[in-house]
Amino acid sequence: GGNLDVQIAAARIDQFIGALGTTRSQLFPQIGYGADASRAQASRIGQPPLPPGADATFSLFQASLGASWQLDLFGRVRRQSEAVQAQVFASEQAQRGVVLTLVSNLATSYIALRALDRQLEIARATTANFEKTAHIFDLRYKQGVVSKVEVMQITSQVQQAKAAIPLFEQAIAAQENLISLLLGRNPGPIPRGKTIDQLLAPAIPADLPSTLLERRPDVLQAEQNPVAANANVAAARAPYYPNISLTGLLGTVSTTFSDLFPGPSRAWRAGGSIAGPIFPFGAVRGQDAP
């Protein structure tokens, strides 16, 4: 088991780390392969017509290795990577904040549990003392030392003290269930450690530097939000500039499988492309809008 909030925060970190890897992969060439085998029949009356005696049915085998690389000359991918990196760091700080909150809640809940334990001990001890006193009053009543009214008063106090015991027991069970929930476990008893008297708050030095505030997870998380926003703005402006790509293909083509890999069957292609907007009619500007 485990605390659900912590699990959600950890899953969010994994999500951004995966997105960071996907974004950064665009900085490198993309390499792939392909293979194809087919059987076809050509038209005998097509253009150009088949020569007399030629077989219209033929096989075609192809194998290729291709690569493409979109050059990030204007920083679109780098800015996107910066934005996702900031989101990764922010999500890590968010998880730290969740963990710190969980630890704080657990500590507070455990202290409350030990306080209830102490109250239950006091209630049981008080009940035992009242019962002893009631027994003494009963003996004295039989001896004619005290009145019936006094016996009834002490008996009422015994009943009141006893009535508090199940209330504390119910409160303890509810507090144990709360701690189990924070721990991500099924409801059940919580092992005890130090008593409430032994739980001392640590001494906090009076001269702590204010720079400690900069280490707070919520502060560090908030610092990354504008970093991610600025990087996203820069990435959104990249479509104003042209996209430049390089492509290459190396392969073989043959009508027979046995001739697929010898030198004469080899084929290759290399090229580049450039494309960019001229009249996007506000599409790019809309992406760039805050």
Specify the residue positions occupied by each region the protein language model found:
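A glycine-/polar-enriched beta->alpha junction
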Residues: G2-Q7, D14-P29, S43, S64-E82, ...
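Transmembrane beta-barrel architecture of outer-membrane proteins
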Residues: L60-Q62, T108, Q153, A267-R269
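Metallo-beta-lactamase
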Residues: F168, P217-D218
